[in-house]
Amino acid sequence: MPLAQLVDLWPEVELVHEDTENGHGGPEDRGRHTSKDEVVVKEIPITHHVKEGAEKADQSHFVLLKVLGQGSFGKVFLVRKITPPDANQLYAMKVLKKATLKVRDRVRTKMERDILADVHHPFVVRLHYAFQTEGKLYLILDFLRGGDLFTRLSKEVMFTEEDVKFYLAELALGLDHLHSLGIIYRDLKPENILLDEEGHIKLTDFGLSKEAIDHEKKAYSFCGTVEYMAPEVVNRQGHSHGADWWSYGVLMFEMLTGSLPFQGKDRKETMTLILKAKLGMPQFLSNEAQSLLRALFKRNATNRLGSGVEGAEELKRHPFFSTIDWNKLYRRELSPPFKPSVTQPDDTYYFDTEFTSRTPKDSPGIPPSAGAHQLFRGFSFVAPVLVEEDAKKTSSPPVLSVPKTHSKNVLFTDVYTVRETIGVGSYSVCKRCVHKGTNMEYAVKVIDKSKRDPSEEIEILRRYGQHPNIITLKDVYEECNSIYLVTELMRGGELLDRILRQKFFSEREACSVLFTVCKTVEYLHSQGVVHRDLKPSNILYVDESGDPESIRICDFGFSKQLRAENGLLMTPCYTANFVAPEVLKRQGYDEGCDIWSLGILLYTMLAGYTPFANGPGDTPEEILARIGS
């Protein structure tokens, strides 16, 4: 891949060390420094020449759909373009108020726009348009439906080494490309790594990036998130692209362990730890992972892996990445470890409902100071691919029958009328309900939030509910104490009721049912999902025909998506009659527990009773004794 020539694009800029967030002395006060009230930053003209076409964009070309996020400088919206050549395309629109930006932050914003306009890489977010009004700046970016890596990390606490290896490998290619353009990223952290709908990463938020350095030049400004700062950034000795590889190591450590390597009780202590503390290496990590971390956590930047003239090539040769095919990775031919469960084009499941529930409104910006107009001259930008594209006719994306999580101010009873109870479980109750607008009948599972977190069940149903033999999730509502899962109504009742009515099934009947169930379980296992509670009462018929093809596997309340390094699960969830012995022993279990349950299911259909019949008060030890006898 040809690389851009390094040129000095910022010859007039001197970003004198910016203030820290507190007034502590110590390591953060070393070197060149300005006081909190004396930020010295020179305003600079835009020097980039971006191909601009007749199709310049403005805010009237976009319809606001949702709020994705909000900060002190402005908001990020989900928007739909309504003018050609890309009508109906969804984007993320970053809106920054000029009047609330300090001069320093205005420079950063302009840098972000210039960097994004120049960078074209599969693992870096793409800028499509940039424009301004009297009071605001607008960046139109890729809308990445998978949310950020921080959200996924906070949910899973820590990742497997294989997961981490994949994310780090894609990240290394993205960082290496930025470095080849003379850009230091300087703010590498999980919040700035987004996931697209396939699960591939995209680097975003270039507000702290420093452009146009080469390996002989250094930046001196104090910036970034303190826990991810390299020692040379902390002590202001000057830093180059090697600072990003230290942050890369911090990110690796956090993903593998669920904690940060250097974190004190406050900012000052954290910085002291970064400069002086010995790294506590978790011994559960592989030798290769430990070796890579040690190579990245070199306090002398010249000795740090990736900091030499070879850059990321050094890192790519490390044994930790021995299984990565870098060419296939760059072409996005390797499957990500996690695919976000998004099917609607405007799905915001992975974004904070605190923001997505708000009414999207782009309020008028306060006019900025006169000097800001000069600073943002030339800010407008249209992606060349859009300029060159013919005004193609694009149809609106199809509206799919997939669930949305409604905000807490929309009540389930506002939309549905609740009817009789269908079934009662340990953590939930199932009722029939009727949609007030369409008069269509559905089932609703009402889950007590204080007893169980249904997020895994919702995610599995959202992702795999389109399978013909898995119950379809229609809607999700969240209220103060309950979650409402609206599904298709199973009018044919449970397989258990059918067995009880007939006493037992013929071999032909049992074979047909088991074939359909096995096909569905095989599909779930191929997707890394273990049901963990297969039994006749969780297998229902969608209608009265009794056709095995009308069977739906339901109740994914105990289900789990396999994520452990060895693929085994340790959480004991079961229905006693159908539970596998390895579940009772808590020895770790995988898809095999579902296969055991299928055997119990077949026995029950043929015999009319379970092979290891038990009373309601039986302990796991008593059930195991029967299984082993």
UniProtKB/Swiss-Prot annotation:
Location of Phosphothreonine modifications: T359, T571
GO molecular function: ATP binding; magnesium ion binding; protein serine kinase activity; ribosomal protein S6 kinase activity
Listed EC numbers: 2.7.11.1
Chain segments annotated as coiled-coil in the UniProt record: none
Top-rank taxon, per record: Eukaryota
Residue sites binding ATP per the record: 68-76, 94, 422-430, 445
Activity regulation as described: Activated by multiple phosphorylations on threonine and serine residues.
Domain Protein kinase, first and last residues per copy: 62-321, 416-629
Keywords: ATP-binding, Kinase, Nucleotide-binding, Phosphoprotein, Repeat, Serine/threonine-protein kinase, Transferase
Domain AGC-kinase C-terminal, chain residue ranges per copy: 322-391
SMART domains the UniProt entry points to: S_TK_X, S_TKc
GO CC terms of this entry: cytoplasm; nucleoplasm
Post-translational modification: Autophosphorylated on Ser-380, as part of the activation process.
Catalytic residues of the enzyme: D187 (proton acceptor), D533 (proton acceptor)
InterPro entries according to UniProt: AGC-kinase_C, Kinase-like_dom_sf, Pkinase_C, Prot_kinase_dom, Protein_kinase_ATP_BS, Ribosomal_S6_kinase_II, RSK_N, Ser/Thr_kinase_AS
GO biological process: positive regulation of DNA-templated transcription; TORC1 signaling
Residue numbers bearing the Phosphoserine modification: S221, S363, S380
One Pfam family named in its UniProt record: Pkinase
Cofactor list: Mg(2+)
SUPFAM superfamilies the UniProt entry points to: Protein kinase-like (PK-like)
Reaction(s) the record says it catalyses: L-seryl-[protein] + ATP = O-phospho-L-seryl-[protein] + ADP + H(+); L-threonyl-[protein] + ATP = O-phospho-L-threonyl-[protein] + ADP + H(+)
Family designation: Belongs to the protein kinase superfamily. AGC Ser/Thr protein kinase family. S6 kinase subfamily.
Role played: Serine/threonine kinase that may play a role in mediating the growth-factor and stress induced activation of transcription.
PANTHER family referenced in this protein's UniProt entry, alphabetically: RIBOSOMAL PROTEIN S6 KINASE
Record protein name field: Ribosomal protein S6 kinase 2 beta
Organism, as annotated: Xenopus laevis
